[in-house]
Amino acid sequence: MGLGPRSAHKARRQFSGAGRRGRAARGSGRPPPGRDGYPRLPAAARAEQAPEALPHLSPEALGYFRRALSALKVAPDAAEERELMARNILKEVEAQALALATNRTGSEMLQELLGFSPLKPLCRVWAALRPNLRFVACHRCGVHVLQSALLQLPRLLRRPAEAEEEEEEEEEGGPSQTLEELVLGLAAEVCDDFLFFCGDTHGSFVVRTLLQVLGGTLLESERGKPRGSQSSETQRTSARECKPTDFEVPKTFLNRLQDLSACFLKDIAVFITDKISSFCLQVALQVLHQKLPQHCAHLCDAVIDYLSSRNSSADGSPLLLFLRDQTSSRLLEQVLLVLEAERLQRLYKDHFQGQLCSLAEHPIANFPLQRLLDAITSPELLSLVFEELSPALEMVLAQGHPGVVVALVEACRRVGTHQAQVLQLLFEAFHCAEPPSRQAACVPLFAALLAYEVYYELMEEEGAVPAEHQVEMATARALREVTVLGSLLLQHLLYFSNPGLVLRSLSALTGPQLLTLAQSPAGSHVFDAILSSPSVTHKQRRRVLKTLKGQYVALACSRHGSRVLDAIWSGAALGARKEIAAELGEKNQELIQDPFGHHVARNVALTTFLKRREAWEQQQSTVAKRRRALSSILED
């Protein structure tokens, strides 16, 4: 989608493919071996890393482990019995660990088995793989087994020391190394040949998981990646919203993490320019930012210093060239997100200032610019960026980069400044600033990311006085498709200190239009902001939500609408709950038969409402009292 200036070129008023990142135009981005000075093992040396004869996994053995895993999954919930089964199965695994790990089906089963494994059996399997560690780490199936083993650490490190001692006493001939020693041994081997592991397509996954485990933090952006056999739907994650899961690790892990951090500094050029290796550095920055911020700052300085020392571009800082590069720009995005506020402001003044508009219009560089906006926390820096970028908002939208505008609006929300100015600029960009009556249409325009003339299919000559907003025309038209970025834009605006104009536009929507918004996968989240924003008063919230009266059954029978109705119900007073229940009760049978509606009926206690009204009211009053008591406790 896009918006354009008021001109004959109306195509520019509509964004085209706005949220996708255009980074696949020039191949993989990874230089061919031998041309970049990147160390590669000779073919003979690589052959030496593999076992002389790769062990074969017989169909009988594969069938046995498949049946054993199925039995383990349906085993009784009793921890001791399930653990005993896992021990017995994994004891059989030890002798065929390499064969299982390097077989596609066997690898998938071994990954699941490790999820059930107690501490010592996992150490035994790991020890069985260790003589061929490099081969397994760089094998397309074996790599996922190593990742799965590493990802068991948060679970296994929580076990009390007494349990470990009991295991050592019970198991004869236990592994010679503890789990901590095995992890440190893997880290030492990776450290000895760091460039090789980081540059290998499969080995880099092990490095990235190892960095997280050593730091005691699992990144959400990486948790969907280990299992190569999973569907693409399962693997999709949001890199922008990276919420780490922390767990306690031994001090030796952090010491080894520092060693790996130093390895990046030795060959910083490779990790900036090589696509596969760059992923490892990006993960390292996130982990170090959480656990060792000083080392993170050193790495950031090394990246910026290296890029700043390259040949200058024609239009200013040499860093600008790398902001437009597929590989290095992704690394710079991560650098921007972890930089300290003072360093971020210095980076802006040294490299970004005066270039924001050209970066915003570039198909690649607009993404690092979005991360810069995401990282801003000081009013001073936001003022500098806002002053430079705000005049170009409409042109940026016309280029199909609404993410930049959404990031700027989010920065205004977060910092708490320039909110009125950015809203006025949005009105102008979407051609609903003048006449003022058009402002009532801002919500449909923002949601669809369409200019006023495009949304309402008007033919206006260039230079003509904009027509007044026609309420009849607006109410008769169905709401257009809600975009993800349009929904985010509305959510940020509703969290502004004064969201009155946006709420007025929401109140102008008809019941069917508001229903369409609630039933939309993206639009339903706008209601989350309406219900939770501290800037929206109870009166304003009620004015918007009362329009949904008569639409409750349709909401309840919708995947996303039912979620919205549940949220409305949770915050509704007793009187509003009676109205909702009465309307739903008229279609009780329809709700019970609907896959989403029957959950709503149960949440509302609709059967009790229809048959025992007094008991229902007493139950709802009790729930309301508990909610008020909990709210007062939380406020205190």
UniProtKB/Swiss-Prot annotation:
InterPro entries: ARM-like (IPR011989), ARM-type_fold (IPR016024), NOP9 (IPR040000), Pumilio_RNA-bd_rpt (IPR001313). Keywords: Phosphoprotein, Repeat, RNA-binding. GO terms for molecular function: RNA binding. Residues 1-41, 222-242 are annotated as: Disordered. It holds the Pfam family PUF_NOP9. It comes from the Eukaryota. Residues 228-237 have a biased composition (Polar residues). Gene3D superfamilies: Leucine-rich Repeat Variant (1.25.10.10). Pumilio repeats lie at residues 92-123, 189-223, 313-348, 351-386, 509-544, 547-581. The modification Phosphoserine is found at S7. Residues 25-41 have a biased composition (Low complexity). Belongs to the NOP9 family. PANTHER family: NUCLEOLAR PROTEIN 9. This is Nucleolar protein 9. It comes from Mus musculus. The gene is Nop9.
